[in-house]
Amino acid sequence: MTALLLALWPLFALIVAGYFLRLRAFPSAEFWPGAERINYFILFPALLFSSLATAPLDNPALPRLAGAVMLALGLAWIALLIAKRLRGWSAGRFGAITQGVLRFNTYLGLAAVGSLFGKEGLALAALMLALMVPTVNVMSVWALTAERGVSVRGLLLPIAKNPLILACVAGALVNLSGLGLPGGTDRLLSLLAAASLPLGLLCVGAALKPQELGGEIPALGWNSAVRLLAVPLLAYGVAMVLGLPDMETTILVLFFALPTAPTAYVLTRQLGGDSHLMAGIITLQTLLAAASLPLVLTLLNG
């Protein structure tokens, strides 16, 4: 427990620091959107690219982990569709709820995996992201637009333009080509990657909106409980059924125990979803994850 807390508390300290820096408008209100963009389009893709470019793609863990990811996401998606039919949610509300249950904070996830498992864990996590990011994006867009319909192009275009997915694909191709990262490229990418996670966590804190917590308390509460407790339990069940080893099980459960992504608010607003509910879900889940994530990982590892 002590080792786990030592690995996780600095990550949440950065999130809290980001919130208070934004609250004080330091260095300026305009800084944070720009910082988020440079991280999303340059620094974080550099981390994913370098992780996959040097990862052992012949690792027998990869097909096991891929199967576990898709099975867990598929089961959660089916449960959401059943709940939508029973509750009669509108597309805008269903889209926010879906993202609250399925999306995950990649910055926090990779930072936690890096603290717990180092480069080996980061390589596995990057490969998980290559599957999870496009799958969850398709589910999110469909959920937000289900009532008015959306073309295949409308579903796939955001995925094809996503810098995280492009970085994963490019890194895997470089790896398979055998070219490696010559001429100091590895050092350049390492420097960019080193800046990504701290800046990303500060931006997560800066994006929190506590004022949105005064709205739909029951919806915020049960959505957070499902995401932070029930979904990790589902992932653990899948890992047990498939017989995943300890490290793979921990990484799988960790990613399914993460709070939802701050970028879910942008997508919800762009596609006409319930952005107020989405903002509240993001904020409450991120705050509660400071307690739930150590709890889940402690129970998982005995």
Predicted regions mapped to residue ranges:
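Alpha-helical transmembrane segments of multi-pass small-molecule/ion transporters
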Residues: M1-G302
